[in-house]
């Protein structure tokens, strides 16, 4: 009975009139509260059919029923820090020069939360933020800086699973649960006479660290308990199709090799990795649920806009990879759901959107004028009354999104233009590495590159991409940045830099022939700068390269 009452109350509250219009800006004390929950590594395709059938996600389903789901939401860079830099700045990656997990925004950069605070909002952040420069391990930095070197070294542990055989163990990711508890306690203490904006960053469902003798543990363990694994429908798990190693795009082969995924995997191994990942997503959903339940108990749900998203997705063995760092759907397609006053219920939006849209949307919710030259666009015109505003939405924003990647585990800067049925992926200088073109309406698994089959479409999309970003120039800048940063680091550690590298994540491969790899680095350092992808010299195996119940426990 309680659940029915809660569902009815929430449904009525969430169908309330829009909190503002374009014609009249609200006073801050009339503005709604905002809660943004951002997880890590969550595949956005799990938030709608058919992906949502594989695992029970009751609170995401609640948001779907009482709010708006964006069916085609994308990260602007499929790796943690650059993606979050885009979300917090509202700018594309090449504009903030957030090239890798070490290089993000300046710590003093003015974010949307800073602006909302200046306009009277109470603000608070808990958990993983990760949008500023200077973080992550030495391994992560050196791997990104040396991706242009002509060698091939495994940088990650082979993906594995680890099960806690306890049907009652709900709190597996302890740190995330602790941050969720802190966020809820803050909600209990906040001054309700003023609007607030709360951010909760979760590390789940990012894979866990794996045992390693290197400087930094690789994060290749999919870890959960029997409690969460029972939320997964094993029969619904799809085993992804793989191209042979010789058929793979050269950048994909490099990524698969550095991620230690070119070896043999049984179908059972692949299915278990995917099942454990989905179980980790279920635990993530439960933390989102604790926030929603707390808002309800505090009589704040009908006054608060709740947003859920993620920095990027998770490959989970699609295209013979785990992690992200790729432009395939599993890596770049993120969840984006919103519910609250003025947001249409049970709406699915097919338009392409991306994380740079968070910045202008947050300010628009608060009735704050948007700064000029943002890369993103507010989503509110579409959310308040989709049928009336969809055409205006399309008129005011372009029908494409941009994603780019410049970090480790890929040996070329990568650029994705997503528009309509098409996904176009360009690399490096646009000439040295073959592009990719996928028709997602016919090839949702992205197994057939039709770039050469449809040269006119490929050319048109490439020209559009170049009108958005001069990607050959950006690639050259990243190449030069990588070289300069590596030289500075090499000088800082002295003549024994090879011994330092020998104890990073790629230590096992490096120690087999350190002289060979030192020579490759020296050749790279003395060669003329070029954004071209490297040609690995190491031989490899294979050819080429109602509100649900709480689950907090």
UniProtKB/Swiss-Prot annotation:
Protein name: Arylsulfatase K
Region spans: Disordered: 530-553
Record-stated family: Belongs to the sulfatase family.
CDD domains from the UniProt entry: ARSK
PTM remark: The conversion to 3-oxoalanine (also known as C-formylglycine, FGly), of a serine or cysteine residue in prokaryotes and of a cysteine residue in eukaryotes, is critical for catalytic activity. The 75-kDa precursor undergoes proteolytic processing to yield a 23 kDa form.
Manner of cofactor binding, per the entry note: Binds 1 Ca(2+) ion per subunit.
Species for this entry: Mus musculus
Active-site positions on this chain: 80
Glycosylation sites noted in the Swiss-Prot or TrEMBL record: 108, 191, 260, 373, 411, 496
Record keyword Metal-binding present: yes
Database matches in Pfam families: Sulfatase
Signal peptide: 1-16
GO CC annotation, single: extracellular region
Matches recorded under InterPro entries: Alkaline_phosphatase_core_sf, ARSK, GAG-degrading_sulfatase, Sulfatase_N
Catalytic activities: an aryl sulfate + H2O = a phenol + sulfate + H(+); Hydrolysis of the 2-sulfate groups of the 2-O-sulfo-D-glucuronate residues of chondroitin sulfate, heparin and heparitin sulfate
Compositionally skewed regions (Low complexity) per UniProt: 534-553
Phenotypic effect of disruption: Mice accumulate significant amounts of heparan sulfate, which exhibits glucuronate-2-O-sulfated non-reducing ends, particularly in brain and kidney.
Entry binding sites for Ca(2+): 40, 80, 311-312
Swiss-Prot/TrEMBL keywords: Calcium, Glycoprotein, Hydrolase, Lysosome, Metal-binding, Secreted, Signal
């Amino acid at each position: 009975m309680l659940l029915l009452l809660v569902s009815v109350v929430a449904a009525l509250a969430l169908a309330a009139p829009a909190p503002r219009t374009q014609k009249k800006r609200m006073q801050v004390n009339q503005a709604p509260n905002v809660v943004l929950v951002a997880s890590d590594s969550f595949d956005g395709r799990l938030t709608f059919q058919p992906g949502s059938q594989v695992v029970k996600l009751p609170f995401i389903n609640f948001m779907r029923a009482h709010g708006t789901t964006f069916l085609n939401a994308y990260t602007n860079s499929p790796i943690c820090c650059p993606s979050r830099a885009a979300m917090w700045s509202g700018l594309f990656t090449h504009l903030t020069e957030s090239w890798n997990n070490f290089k993000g925004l300046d710590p003093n950069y003015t974010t949307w939360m800073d602006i909302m605070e200046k306009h009277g909002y109470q603000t608070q952040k808990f958990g993983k933020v990760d949008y500023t420069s200077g973080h992550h391990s030495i391994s992560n930095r050196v791997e990104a800086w040396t991706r242009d070197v002509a060698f091939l070294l495994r940088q990650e542990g082979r993906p594995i699973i680890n099960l806690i055989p306890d049907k009652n163990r709900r709190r597996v990711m302890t740190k995330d649960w602790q941050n969720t508890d802190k966020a809820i306690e803050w909600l209990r203490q906040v001054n309700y006479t003023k609007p607030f904006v709360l951010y909760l960053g979760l590390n789940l469902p990012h894979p866990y660290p794996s045992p390693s003798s290197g400087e930094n543990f690789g994060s290749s363990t999919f870890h959960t308990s029997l409690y969460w694994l029972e939320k997964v429908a094993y029969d619904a798990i799809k085993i992804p199709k793989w191209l042979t190693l010789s058929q793979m795009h050269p950048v994909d082969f490099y990524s698969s090799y550095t991620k230690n995924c070119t070896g043999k995997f049984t179908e059972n191994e692949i299915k278990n990795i995917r099942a454990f990942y989905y179980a980790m997503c279920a635990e993530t959903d439960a933390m989102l649920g604790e926030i929603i339940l707390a808002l309800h108990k505090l009589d704040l749900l009908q006054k608060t806009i709740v947003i859920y998203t993620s920095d990027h997705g998770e490959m989970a063995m699609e295209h013979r990879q785990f992690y992200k760092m790729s432009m395939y759907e599993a890596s770049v397609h993120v969840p984006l759901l919103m519910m609250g006053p003025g947001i249409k219920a049970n709406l699915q939006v097919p338009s392409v959107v991306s994380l740079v849209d968070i910045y202008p949307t947050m300010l628009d919710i608060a009735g704050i004028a948007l700064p000029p030259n943002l890369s993103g666009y507010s989503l509110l015109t579409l959310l308040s009354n989709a049928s009336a505003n969809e055409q205006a939405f399309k008129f005011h924003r372009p029908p494409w999104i941009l994603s780019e990647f410049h970090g480790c585990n890929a040996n070329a800067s990568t650029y994705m233009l997503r528009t309509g049925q098409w996904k176009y992926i360009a690399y490096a200088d646009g000439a040295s590495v073959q592009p990719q073109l996928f028709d997602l309406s016919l090839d949702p698994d992205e197994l057939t590159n039709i770039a050469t089959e449809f040269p006119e479409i490929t050319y048109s999309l490439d020209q559009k991409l170049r009108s958005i970003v001069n990607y050959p120039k950006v690639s050259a800048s990243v190449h030069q940045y990588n070289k300069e940063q590596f030289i500075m680091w090499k000088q800082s550690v002295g003549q024994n830099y090879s011994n330092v590298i020998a104890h990073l994540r790629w230590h096992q491969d490096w120690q087999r022939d350190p002289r060979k790899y030192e020579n490759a680095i020296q050749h790279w350092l003395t060669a003329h700068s070029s954004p071209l992808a490297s040609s690995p010299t190491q031989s490899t195996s294979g050819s080429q390269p109602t509100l649900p119940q709480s689950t907090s426990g």
